[in-house]
């Protein structure tokens, strides 16, 4: 028998990286929020790599912070090393990556949730949703407890019908031998949701004491203090190194000789794996001309000897994994503490979602994270904060928030999922963003703090500091634009010493900065400000001046996109009534139900000719009501 256990505005199911952001975003907006998780000891657990950030993903972490989320602050408090990647490249592809102390990361995040007003944490297994009048009105747990709410966010990760596969051994399990969620998956199918089967994997963990580090290359963190959060003022200085080694021809031979025992090649694994994070057996087969592959040895924390063998994800049998490890320089006598494994799980087809991450089938039900077909902690957290914002706002009777592709990588991620869907675990890449020069690591606050403030996730104090930073950037740009640097003997000598050509005449400081050999520091040596300019302000000034032409071009493209985004498609449109649209396009439009002409144009199978016909139809105002 069921019993009524509580009434909330929002219930979040799952407390992984999507769940914690969803719960915090909801609660911080003033919605009474419950987060239910199978195991309270596994809040924000990292079942795979102990790291946060990297290309595109690191920018998402900063976007989460600019909106008022927690991931950036948490990793700033708990990392063991941090590096800025792609420093030799342009600002569009730079990104932070941090190695986490995974246990401290969990502990700190759980503490944050426990101390958040409006937020209740409970351990429990959700098996069914409460559906009333076609809308989601809460959840029912394994013990019969009914938690009623106005909205529900599912962030179930890889737990839905999870199955661990290791060699010829397979069993029902969530990640890291956690209890899987079987009945909720079956219930979603009963409700009419289309599910797909995906797979991900993890490498073995080895004992640090048994590694011969003299045969590996040290990979230290940056000496310059780094942080993901715009609010971080205290930096961790005692960083731990990672280590680089490589597979050998012997490693590849062992893998080749045991492919018949690999669940990936025996047909035992049915789920589709992530393209951009292949297993070692996949790498050896697909790139058989490569004599070796990189292996990074990453400590899992400060108070453990477990080391994560990055680059060796595998589901080969345990005995093969042991042999394989012993052929890698530095790991000849290594002790394997945990074997690598693959995990299969259910995900929903994400074209069943609106851009708010609410399901089209059941109003009031939102989904975020790996349940939507993505891979990665950062992608999960980015969806989590948006699902939490929108579930909270719906519960409080407020307007939805949708980030566009030109606002944020989070906008690109969600738009790709709900518009194009995915037939493999989706990973965010810089190449997926058309406006990547606008979506930089350095300007996430300038893009999104205003939105975070408007929805109540950014404090008044932080917002004032943000406004001061914006004003300082504009003031310094204006100052440099007004300064003329004259071709004096000293100035000419200085410019020549930097490898630049002499000035023919006086030049604006802003124009001088656009020269490849010049930067903010070198230009302000010739035209110093009255007071020292903060480092983050100087960085913005330099990027905005140096890349002004490219940024301007991107902004013009965004304006064109906005015109298309503003051409809304009424929900009551009947695509069957539009003559001339191709059959495939009609089917896709009916499935995705795009909100705007711009979104319609991004659906695969919808061609420019179909968009032209749709535009004419909309402009003529011939919107037929859907047949009752």
Swiss-Prot record:
Note the Pfam families from the entry.
GIDA, GIDA_C_1st, SAM_GIDA_C
Name the GO cellular-component terms: cytosol
**What are the disulphide bonds in this sequence?**
none
**Which InterPro entries does this entry report, sorted A to Z?**
FAD/NAD-bd_sf (IPR036188), GIDA_C_N (IPR049312), MnmG (IPR004416), MnmG-rel (IPR002218), MnmG-rel_CS (IPR020595), MnmG_C (IPR026904), MnmG_C_subdom (IPR047001), MnmG_C_subdom_sf (IPR044920)
Q: Which UniProt keywords apply?
A: Cytoplasm, FAD, Flavoprotein, NAD, tRNA processing
| Residue sites binding FAD per the record | 14-19, 126, 181, 370
Q: Does the keyword field hold Phosphoprotein?
A: no
Q: Fetch the NCBIfam families from UniProt.
A: mnmG_gidA
Name of protein? tRNA uridine 5-carboxymethylaminomethyl modification enzyme MnmG
Which gene underlies this protein? mnmG
